[in-house]
Curated annotation (Swiss-Prot):
Lineage, highest ranks first: Bacteria, Bacillati, Bacillota, Bacilli, Lactobacillales
Name the UniProt record assigns to this protein: Protein translocase subunit SecA
Subunit field text: Monomer and homodimer. Part of the essential Sec protein translocation apparatus which comprises SecA, SecYEG and auxiliary proteins SecDF. Other proteins may also be involved.
Parts of the chain that traverse the membrane: none
Function: Part of the Sec protein translocase complex. Interacts with the SecYEG preprotein conducting channel. Has a central role in coupling the hydrolysis of ATP to the transfer of proteins into and across the cell membrane, serving as an ATP-driven molecular motor driving the stepwise translocation of polypeptide chains across the membrane.
Membrane topology label: Peripheral membrane protein
Amino acid sequence: MANILKTIIENDKGEIRRLEKMADKVFKYEDQMAALTDDQLKAKTVEFKERYQNGESLDSLLYEAFAVVREGAKRVLGLFPYKVQVMGGIVLHHGDVPEMRTGEGKTLTATMPVYLNALSGKGVHVVTVNEYLSERDATEMGELYSWLGLSVGINLATKSPMEKKEAYECDITYSTNSEIGFDYLRDNMVVRAENMVQRPLNYALVDEVDSILIDEARTPLIVSGANAVETSQLYHMADHYVKSLNKDDYIIDVQSKTIGLSDSGIDRAESYFKLENLYDIENVALTHFIDNALRANYIMLLDIDYVVSEEQEILIVDQFTGRTMEGRRYSDGLHQAIEAKEGVPIQDETKTSASITYQNLFRMYKKLSGMTGTGKTEEEEFREIYNIRVIPIPTNRPVQRIDHSDLLYASIESKFKAVVEDVKARYQKGQPVLVGTVAVETSDYISKKLVAAGVPHEVLNAKNHYREAQIIMNAGQRGAVTIATNMAGRGTDIKLGEGVRELGGLCVIGTERHESRRIDNQLRGRSGRQGDPGESQFYLSLEDDLMKRFGSERLKGIFERLNMSEEAIESRMLTRQVEAAQKRVEGNNYDTRKQVLQYDDVMREQREIIYAQRYDVITADRDLAPEIQSMIKRTIERVVDGHARAKQDEKLEAILNFAKYNLLPEDSITMEDLSGLSDKAIKEELFQRALKVYDSQVSKLRDEEAVKEFQKVLILRVVDNKWTDHIDALDQLRNAVGLRGYAQNNPVVEYQAEGFRMFNDMIGSIEFDVTRLMMKAQIHEQERPQAERHISTTATRNIAAHQASMPEDLDLSQIGRNELCPCGSGKKFKNCHGKRK
């Protein structure tokens, strides 16, 4: 182990020496660039672009380009990048992560690789964790880029598709990670190529890269469509039942945060819902509601996992930042179960139309890099998942912060009492204090204690993060006391006020250890920026989550023997033990993310195939007849082959029924037409007849553009519907194969094999539906459209299934508004023939 660590340290030192030499080459151009006039310096951008177009690589342009940015930054921003910032910029250009401490100027560091890569004209995405940082950085650094002749765009959620497209067309685009993901998904749901907003993903530079690529790696971005099933009553019933349970009726696994019914709980469920057997196959839906109600009531905690807004909505709290995640909902019905628990209106359950995780989104970029102050602890994951190295960059000035050993108390109460006393003492001498908490309720609790102690303070948590930057900027002033959930205000520097250095700088107090060392290091890093003095101190108790999960029983005995209910244990050994526990949790979390990626890679491969074919359809300026006719041919072959082993009479009857109801006019084919033919001859006979029907259908459109539009809309409508259903099916499969793991089967291998089979089935189903709709659609004879704008509407309107006509003798007054329409459209009656005129 010691040898491995030695090798890693030596490698890092060698890398630093190499970067220093490269930075020196940039510095050699300093005088040359300083001698240029403003116009001459700006003209360098055009020169670099031409040299790149003529075959010169970005690597060879690096030294001059970085020197141009340094000089430009000095003239425009009044900032001159240090050597360590140039080194960080080189690492970013190479597609790696420079680990740069808080306050080392990561934003300015990014300007050099962003400028260099923007010269290619293929687009650079600067990715931030929230829109405030996107707008701030785009405004501040955009001044420099614009001065140097590059265009800068900001992609915000509120922008229209046209505005988004303009932002993505710029040389440099600032955006949040979620908006890039949603735009990618939406681009793959449009019907026309001109409605796509993104260009191919080229180079991403991700700010706070660990937060996005590690903490949020498993977060799926989901574009949903409302599900028509009205299930709010079942949510309320399940919630009412679960609230009636005793502690013996359910079993919670604290480590894995899972919950299930005990035997007595099952008995109570069968009695409550009047069932013979809760786990009969017909009760599968009900057990799903009960499982969610259990999780909502006994696992998900108010003010820790979620908050209830003033608008009576459930808002998820990000466990790493403490911010509420606007617009984000728990999937699979859990969010509705929480709504039932809290007695707020239950919103419609949604169906996933498209989804992608950040892991797979960012792996699609040709080059990916990012910045963080705390990436080394996750180096293995960056390397294994993203093929990125983490290179620690030296600080411009030595770190002067004093990190005290952890203080461990027997109870939460005695811990918080000590925290309040410490804060009060520091406040009285004028030293600013930042108190970091892991949950909203902890912030509120400490706030009440400080009010009682007469200590004025600011609270920054998920409930008021819109004031984040303002509060954080003032946190370094004399006498300032700020309480913040761990990651709040990240990206905004805390600058020390007048006279604060002499008082010891900013003191950071952690109220418990996070399960990730990196988050603790980020909290510590708020103090001691740019060589400032500072302190950090963590207060722990045996009742903290991390301590309860890993070995607090032995320490509890020590406290009891020494009768130390109010006193603290302080030792380096304790700090090392806590870090060992954190390493175990980090290892577990990494293994989980790695497994999620194995599952998601199945979806990724399938998504890429579907999206590539979809893109081919929407960008095709050609007649898609060859593609559709191939689908018809394969559909015929599947049907005939599928009945190959049946008795001759049964086989012919099945094939005839298929042909009548899906392929040809009903009265145009009889049993005599097929009898006596081999399977091969039947396939050929049906295909030739189908081609005549196809030609007849297309001839009704009488316009080449209308034909193309009809073909596109037909294929895309079927593909999108089937893909949406397939995503749901894969989600259900994933849950199911998890159970198969108990039968000694590898669930990932099972998922891959079953997922591949399901994908092939979906392709067959797509081709079948395209065939049926193409052959059976009622296409009305129409004149040539007068203007192109009419084409889409008429072509879309003409896709009406042959069966979608209403029986003449039906009494419509007897049909419920939420029942399926009898015309066969698949819509609810109220949305079809029951629409109020």
